[in-house]
Every structure is written in C-alpha cells, then in structure tokens.
Swiss-Prot record:
Protein name per UniProt: ATP-dependent zinc metalloprotease FtsH 2
General function of this protein: Acts as a processive, ATP-dependent zinc metallopeptidase for both cytoplasmic and membrane proteins. Plays a role in the quality control of integral membrane proteins.
Active site: 428
Cofactor, how bound (note): Binds 1 zinc ion per subunit.
Cofactor: Zn(2+)
Cytoplasmic side of membrane: 1-3, 133-689
Binding residues annotated for Zn(2+), in chain numbering: 427, 431, 503
Phylogenetic classification of the source organism: Bacteria, Bacillati, Bacillota, Clostridia, Peptostreptococcales
Gene: ftsH2
Biological processes, Gene Ontology terms: protein catabolic process; proteolysis
Disulfide bond sites: none
Length: 689
C-alpha cells in the first residue's frame, strides 16, 4: 500500500504539472492591448475597430491604435451599460461594412477539468486516513492492518542463538522445561504414547529473575520459530482489534509450527474478568475470551506451545490457569548462593578482574539479588573502575558497587551541619549496636553517615546464608533493630527527629503482618484477619474486606501496639547497658564516616581503640593490617573447602568408574552365558537330526 501511494502520487503530480503547462504555455503568446470600456467605445465610434468577437460580455478583436498599428485588443462590457445602445452602434458599423463581427457560445470547461476538484478532495481524504492510521498504529503498520498481530518472529538466523548453556543459576527451572524442548524436537514419541505436552507454561517470578531469557533459551534449544509479543500489544483504541490480533497470531503460528508463542506481561490482558465498577463491555475481556478459545482449540499435534511471563499471578483469570491452557507454572525466583556465583561468572566474562576479586565472597554478599541486579552490579563496578582510570576491577570497587546498587549514589558533596552529623552518627550507631547485640539478626555489613539516595545515612546488614522462612523471634528482633536509631536519639540527644520515619513505617508493617497474616499473637491465636484478595482495577484499601468485628479490630491494634512497645523497651535496655559501645561507634563514624564489617567488629570488640585526638591517617593503617590478616584467613579457609570438594569429586569419579566396570563385567558374563546356551541348543538340534 505504501508503494502504491508513492507511485500514484507521482503520476497525479505529473498529470497536474502537464495540464498546467498545456493550459498556460501550450498556446502561442501574442501581445494584446487591454482596453477599458470607455476607450473601446470611442474606438468603435471612430471606426478604429475592424474586428469584434463577442463572448458573453467580453469583446476581443483587432483595432487600430494611436500609432495607426493594427493590434489585438480585449475589453469587457460592464452591466450598467445599455446593451441595446451597443447593439445599435455595432449594427450601424456592420451596415457600413467597416466592422466584422463574430460571436461564440459561453466557454465550457472540459469534463476532466471539472472533475479535478472532486478528485483532489478524495485524494486529500485518502492521504488523511493513511496518516491517521499510521499514527494510531505507531507508524509501523500498513493501512487497514490494525487487526494484524504485532508479534515479532525470531528465527535461528537472527542474532545469537541462546541455549540452556547461556542461562546460569536456574538449574531447577531448566530441568522443568527440558521435556518441553524434547517435545518440540521429537513430538511423535509423545503422540504415539497418547501423552499431551502442556499447552501453556506460565513463568512466574519477580522482575529481573530471567523469565524472558529462559524462554528464549527454550526456543533456541529446540531450534523452532519464536513469536514474542507483549500483553499490552493486543488492545488499542479500536473495538475488536484485540480479538482480531489474537486470531491472526495463532494463524501465523500454525503456519510456522512447531513453534513457541511468548506473551510477556500477560497480566495486561489476562486479568480477572468482571473487575471494576462499570457494567459495560470491556474490550480487554473480549481479547481474553478469544485467547482462551484459541489456547484450548488447536490440536495436540500442531506443535504450538504458549509460554507467558508475569510477576502478578494473583490477578490472572482462573480460566487462564486451568488444565488445558496454562496448566504448568514454573516459579523463577531469586537465585541461591550457588546460582549467584554462576551468574557472576557469566557477567564477569569480558571484564578484567583483579586477583583479589573473589566471586564466592561476592555471592555471599549479594543475597536476594536477581540476575538483573547482578548484571547491573558488574556493570556498575566496571563504570566505577573506568571513573578511577584503573585497568582492572578490584574487590573494593565491586563492594562499592554493591552498596551503590542497594543504597544509591554516594553524596559526599552535600554540606551537612555538625549537629546533623552527630544526630546521624548516633542514629546509625544505635542500629548497628543493637544488631550486634541481638542473636537472631543479620550481621552488620556496613555503617555510614554519608548520604546516599534519599537517606542521610544507613546501616546495612546482610545474612550469612539464604533464608526462606522467618521465625517469630527473628521478626521481633528485626523490630528491635529498626527502633535502635530512634531510641539512640532519645537517650543521647534527649530529642527525636524525622530520620526514623521509614524505620517506623517498617516497624508498623512487620507488627501488623505478625498479627493479621501470620497468626503470631498469643491473644488472638492462629488466625488471619482481612481478605488478601481485592479488585485488580481498584485501590486495595477501597476494596479490602474486613471479615472481623470492630471489637476484634481494636484487639488487633492492641496486639500491634504490644509488639512495638515490648520491642521499644528491649531496645532501651540494650542501649542503656551498652552506652559505652554506642559512644565508641558514633565517635568512629564521626571520624571515619564509613565502617565496613571488619572495622565495625574491631572497634566494637575493642581490638582497635580510637582516641579523641586520633586522625584518619592514624586509624586507617591499623584497620588495613587487621583486614589483611582476616582476608588471608578467609583465603586459607576457602582453599581448604576447595580441597575437600576436590576430594569428594575424586571419590564420585572413582565410584562411577567402578560402577561402569561392574556393568561391563556383568554384561560380558551375560554374553558368555548366552553363547554357551546357544552352543547347547545347537548340539541338541544336531542330535535330534
């Protein structure tokens, strides 16, 4: 259609130009005197007009000018002049045979010239419609193709082929989809056995965990066409477009079968039906209905598999998740420590790492990081190294990148008064000291009073191992840890500030969850309160259901207050009994501004004493010596662990070798026994003959 418009516009423009040339330049040019009527009238009366050609009220012909030269003329008879008088004069001149008069009918415009305005208006309308459709469809589709699918087809020859070897840290998830790949490679094996491969696989997990990447690996491993489309690409401004695009998508997929259709962010089109306050028809629901029909309508041997990804499975329509549609769900969560190490190895490729960079240590220090976070971490480390004009990425640079990813950009240039520095130091020291004194909190990784992001300072605690459950004691101690900053301000400065606002929000949230979600209240018992389900298009608070009475609501508030008050009292007790530790850490923060895990541990235990007159250049060498000793000890411990792992691996290899030899021996024995049996059978046959 676009080529047609280009060709048609060229020919139309050429036709108009040629017509203009013919109309204006096709006739020979001749000099004509333009006479007003009074001059023409005098010339007519004085016998100076020899020819007159009448066309309605205009007169053309030949006259004799003042130089006695015959020239062409043109004049116009005004309506106010009497035609009868002009007629009498002309008749008189004709009778005298001094004037030749001719007349012509009114000029008529050729039919094709009369059609030009209409044709021009039609062309303008077509061009306007074409531009309108281009804009409404994002400029990438053709006219009248708004009902076509926007899915992009990826084939083997397009770019780099991704396989399971390129996916790190998702061993269980890869195992879950291996049979899917086998079905795409060998579908007859399943069809002959009457087996049905899952028609739809739903990838569920937080953002950045690798759902899309894993799906690309499935397509690359199977070597089949891969259609990708976003859930928001179905519904647009025209009614019926969504359902039409779903039909077109499946028609394209059937032509390319076996293939994979990947719908990213399917919650955009697969939300629960009937949600919202309006009672009118929803275009999104029509699209969802068509998707449901298409998914449950194709045959078992067509080789079309739907893979979708979402981080909101709770809002998907139940009909979408039933067997026969998305009947298998693959949970793609954050990787564990082993998976993080594998992902770090992948993203460390092509980056020059210094010898002190230990990926195992980095994997332990990045709990909860998704693959996207780890990729961003290594990229930030490379950027920081380039900013420092260094050739290799050092361990301290990667640790700085970890802090930047978690807490934000460091703002050393911000001017802070001494009063606020002291307030921040005691606030963060309160968090750190309480975390150190408690037994079920994560170890302190870093404490700083340098502003980062929106925080004036922060205390970072990191777990030593991956956790999947949280106990009641851990939640209570976490509340105590969060209250450490507020309590330290009150005990030392005898005042409180707004710096604890975020801490208090988290305290209230944890305490409420303990009572209403996890049944950790002794008074209310093992019950949950409130309905977690709510309408997907409306506010949670607007549609949340209170399945309890007002009396129970008051008891819930009392239990929440009880948890918080008990934690506050414990925090006051801990800091009061360890006030000397609080002052030591706060003074160290005022001098050093940032304490890492080693420095905090050494100062807290008194291994390094910081005097009032000590300067940064006096303290830093002491810290460096102790840190070097600890790193050497960690390296020796890791070497010992690696040695033990190597021994275990050797044992496994020897066992496998022994099993293989035994299998070979058993197989040879069976073959020998079979040969003996064959010899006996042959001997018996000869005897019978």
């Amino acid at each position: 259609m676009r080529k047609f418009f280009r060709g048609a516009s060229f020919y139309i423009l050429a036709f108009i130009i040629i017509l203009f040339i013919v109309q204006n330049f096709g006739r020979p040019t001749q000099e004509i005197d333009e006479l007003d009527f009074s001059e023409f009238y005098r010339a007519l009366v004085n016998d100076r007009v020899t020819e007159a050609h009448l066309v309605e009220r205009s007169v053309e012909g030949i006259w004799v000018n003042n130089n006695n030269e015959e020239m062409s003329y043109r004049s116009f008879v005004p309506e106010v002049f009497s035609e009868e008088r002009l007629t009498l004069i002309i008749e008189e001149k004709i009778d005298q045979e001094g004037l030749r008069v001719s007349a012509a009918p009114p000029p008529t415009t050729p039919w094709f010239i009369e059609l030009l305005p209409s044709i021009f208006m039609v062309l303008i309308f077509i061009v306007f419609w074409f531009v309108f459709m281009q804009q409404s469809q994002g400029g990438g589709n053709r006219v009248m193709s708004f009902g076509k699918s926007k899915a992009k087809l990826h084939k083997d020859d397009e770019g780099k082929r991704i396989t399971f070897d390129d996916v790190a840290g998702l061993d269980e998830e890869k195992a879950e989809v291996e049979e899917l790949v086998d079905f795409l490679k060998n579908p007859k094996k399943y069809i002959e056995l009457g087996a049905r491969i899952p028609k739809g696989i739903l990838m569920i997990g937080p953002p950045g965990t690798g759902k899309t990447y894993l799906t690309k690996a499935v397509a690359g491993e199977a070597g089949v066409p891969f259609f990708s489309i976003s859930g928001s690409d179905f519904v647009e401004m025209f009614v019926g477009v969504g359902a039409s695009r779903v039909r077109d998508l499946f028609e394209q997929a059937k032509k390319s079968a076996p293939c994979i259709i990947f719908i990213d962010e399917i919650d955009a089109v697969g939300r629960k039906r009937g949600a919202g306050l309006g009672g009118g028809h929803d275009e999104r629901e029509q699209t969802l209905n068509q998707l449901l029909v298409e998914m449950d309508g194709f045959g078992i041997n067509e080789g079309i598999i739907i893979v979708a990804a979402t981080n909101r499975p709770d809002i998907l329509d139940p009909a979408l998740l039933r067997p026969g549609r998305f009947d298998r769900q693959v949970m793609v969560g954050a990787p564990d420590i082993k998976g993080r190490e594998q992902i770090l190895q992948v993203h460390a490729k092509g980056k020059p790492l210094d010898e002190d960079v230990n990926l195992k240590v980095l994997a332990r220090r990045t709990p909860g990081f998704t693959p996207a976070d780890i990729e961003n971490l290594m990229n930030e480390a490379a950027l920081l190294t380039a900013r420092k004009n260094e050739k290799k990425i050092k361990m301290e640079t990667v640790e700085e990148a970890i802090t930047k990813v978690i807490a934000g950009l460091e703002k050393k240039s911000r001017v802070i008064s001494e009063k606020e520095r002291k307030l921040t130091a005691y606030h963060e020291a309160g968090h750190a000291v309480v975390a150190k004194l408690l037994t079920h909190t994560d170890p302190v990784h870093q404490v700083t009073i340098i502003p980062r992001g929106r925080a004036g300072g922060f205390t970072m605690t990191l777990p030593t191992e991956d956790k999947y459950y949280v106990t009641k004691t851990e939640m209570q101690e976490h509340i105590v840890h969060l209250l450490g900053g507020r309590v330290a301000e009150k005990l030392v400065l005898h005042d409180i500030s707004t710096g604890a606002s975020n801490d208090l929000q988290r305290v209230s949230s944890i305490a409420r969850a303990m009572v209403t979600q996890y049944g950790m209240s002794d008074k209310l018992g093992s019950m949950t309160f409130g309905d977690g389900d709510s309408e997907v298009f409306l506010g949670r608070d607007f549609t949340s259901k209170h399945n309890y009475s007002e009396e129970v609501a008051a008891e819930i508030d009392q239990e929440i207050r009880k948890f918080v008050e008990e934690a506050y009292m414990l925090t006051e007790k801990l800091l009061t009994e360890n006030m000397d530790k609080l002052h030591v850490i706060a003074q160290a923060l005022l001098k050093l501004e940032t304490l890492d895990a080693d420095a905090f541990e050494m100062i807290f235990t008194g291994e390094i004493v910081i005097g009032k007159d000590d300067q940064l250049e006096d303290i830093q060498p002491k810290l460096n010596v102790v840190k070097a000793k600890k790193r050497a000890a960690e390296a020796a411990e890791e070497a010992e662990v690696a040695k033990e792992d190597a021994k275990k691996q050797d044992v496994k290899v020897s066992l496998k070798k022994q099993e293989k030899e035994e299998l070979i021996e058993v197989s040879s024995d069976k073959e020998e026994e079979k040969d003996n049996q064959d010899d006996q059978d042959n001997e018996e046959n000869r005897k019978e003959e």
